[in-house]
């Protein structure tokens, strides 16, 4: 499948059809009624923004993990066997990461989530 970059969100190459090709050519020429001049985010900007966002999320997760593991781990902390780190827990980490550090142990977070801390 040939790779190409279209200015509009439309199929590229032979599968595009005449209408999509014509719209793309209008945009390239800057004709009236085309998308040129309107606020658009280029693919390069989108990728850069996404990379920055991903890097920020990684920093948050690393910080939260470091905070959790630096807490004293009492032997009485419940350990839930067979429970996986789920998407729900990951979301909780992200939504709570901007707040204060939780006093919960890592095991308690894994077992019960932020709501029990």
UniProtKB/Swiss-Prot annotation:
Instruction: Tell me what organism the protein belongs to.
Output: Homo sapiens (Human)
- Top-level division of the source organism's lineage: Eukaryota
What is the name of the protein in this document?
Uncharacterized protein MIR1-1HG
